[in-house]
């Protein structure tokens, strides 16, 4: 992000706002770690907004404020969380923390699937749009992961059936996109990473993390049983 500012892509005022409000993001990561007992994965600030189109010919687009991305490095798979600069700059505390928590759930689900080699056709959508903001059925039940009641409220409030924050979207449109600040456009139907089987085989997951994910799965099972009775 500092490089983008140095190269003139981000105005001084916007850069200062991002730097100043970055503490809200750090506080969110710390909060998620305390509420789950699990370390947050590697994350970075993307100095752009990411927009996604259903297909190349579509005029409709969605804004992706953060993404959980599998990356192949040294013939191994790593999962990183990309946090967009406009979310840091313009998001309210509750919104930022809810989005970070939601991405954290994606991270845990991906680790679970990788550990079980449960990846359909050896492919993962690298923007995970259908998962990130609409398909919550593939995620762990937040109550099985977090013990922070306020954080859980933020998640359920922001992600009832798919993330929408009209005030934040309006701010990003007016203060970022219309001002021609850095924007990455991706098409949902072309943004797929193929993950070779040997890469999955080479990927070693921390056994302590796997134990914690197994405990989460047990909690999910107990919560489902409670719903049945």
Task: Show where each model-derived region lies.
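Acidic/histidine-rich, surface-exposed loop or edge segments in extracytoplasmic proteins
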Residues: 3-13
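Active-site recognition of the HExxH zinc-binding catalytic motif
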Residues: 98-111
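Zn2+-dependent metallopeptidase catalytic core
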Residues: 18-41
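Pan-zinc metallopeptidase signature
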Residues: 153-229
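Short amphipathic alpha-helical segments
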Residues: 17-24, 92-96, 100
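Long, charged, glycine-rich C-terminal linkers/tails
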Residues: 42-50
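Post-HExxH zinc-binding segment in Zn-dependent metallohydrolases
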Residues: 112-159
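Active-site scaffold of zinc-dependent metalloenzymes
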Residues: 56-94, 111
